Amino acid sequence: AGARVYRRYNHQQVGKGYALDYLFKCLSASGKDVYDGYFVFDADNYVDPNFVREMNNTFDGGHYAALTSYRNSKNFGANWISAGYGLWFLREARFLNFPRMLLGTNCAISGTGFLVSGEVIREKGGWPFHLLTEDIEFSVNCAIDGKVIGYCDKAVIYDEQPVDFKQSW
């Protein structure tokens, strides 16, 4: 086991979108971009032991540009702020993405806990989504391009939520 770390030192182009773009371009330049898909997580996420299997089962079942998962809260009961965030992500999963998946319409990725198709990364030449809300930018781009984002309700990640307003901004 082990990990390969790609260090990036760019103080002008900051943010997750630029970091993902840099990583995918490094993988491509070194000939390591032959994967079916790539998972995107935040460093503080806890990934359910069945996550990869469930996402893979859904990914294999259709031609998806990306898949999103159920984003649960690690600290739902900490206070009303963290609980509010937890309820927001529950609403997003159960009342937006789950029904859309059942109806065969487009879902949306949201921040963390998603799988993006290697084919899409290769077509785009990396991750050209650099807005602060790069997840929304990607989701809209998929809709414009006629690419489908799916949802896997059995794949769960646990994400730590802010406990005060300063953290949430």
Label the model's feature ranges:
Residues 7-32, 50-132, 169:
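Long helical/loop segments within the catalytic core of UDP-sugar-dependent glycosyltransferases
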Residues 32-46:
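Short beta-strand-to-loop acidic/aromatic patch adjacent to the donor-nucleotide binding site
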Residues 130, 139-157:
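Catalytic donor-sugar/metal-binding loop of nucleotide-sugar-dependent glycosyltransferases
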Residues 14, 45-47, 72-75, 137, ...:
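A short, conserved beta-strand element in the Rossmann-like catalytic core
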